[in-house]
């Protein structure tokens, strides 16, 4: 299953991720880790209690307080009752600085891309 990625924005104090074609998908787990954290050291919450509303998954500071600056890799799995055999995994590079949040490009080690989308030099 290739990973999806999406845009990040700040809405009030919340950090929000746009979810295209959200349907009835909801988060089953989420990991927010500083960029460069090894796979073994990543921390995941398997009952996040977060919901997708209006095509956005928003993380309030009461769930995770992003510091004033840094880069984070946010990973989450969305599941659907209607499409229970088609979970969706997202990996998003989130940068924080100067009171704003922004996307940064992920490396091939940070995200699994669909076969054929990786450019290979000949």
Language model features by range: what are they?
Residues 55-92:
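Extracytoplasmic/surface-exposed domains of secreted proteins
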Residues 1-38, 88-122:
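N-terminal non-catalytic regions of secreted/periplasmic and cell-surface proteins
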Residues 15, 42-44, 64, 70, ...:
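Short non-domain terminal segments
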Residues 3-5, 18-20, 47, 54, ...:
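Short, flexible coil/linker segments at or flanking structured domains
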Residues 10, 52, 65-69, 97:
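Surface-exposed coil/turn segments at beta-strand junctions on protein surfaces, enriched
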Residues 8, 50, 80-82:
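Assembly/interface hotspot detector across virion components, adhesins/toxins, and nucleic-acid enzymes
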Residues 39-53:
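Solvent-exposed serine/threonine-rich low-complexity stretches and specific carbohydrate-binding patches
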């Amino acid at each position: 299953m290739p990973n999806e990625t999406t845009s990040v924005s700040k809405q009030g104090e919340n950090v929000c991720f746009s979810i295209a074609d959200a349907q009835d998908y909801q988060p089953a787990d989420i990991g927010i880790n500083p960029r460069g954290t090894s796979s073994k050291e990543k921390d995941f919450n398997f009952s996040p209690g977060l919901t997708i509303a209006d095509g956005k998954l928003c993380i309030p500071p009461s769930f995770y307080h992003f510091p004033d600056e840094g880069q984070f890799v946010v990973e989450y799995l969305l599941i659907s009752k209607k499409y229970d055999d088609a979970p969706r995994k997202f990996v998003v590079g989130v940068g924080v600085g100067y009171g704003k949040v922004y996307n940064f490009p992920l490396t091939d080690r940070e995200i699994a891309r669909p076969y054929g989308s990786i450019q290979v030099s000949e």
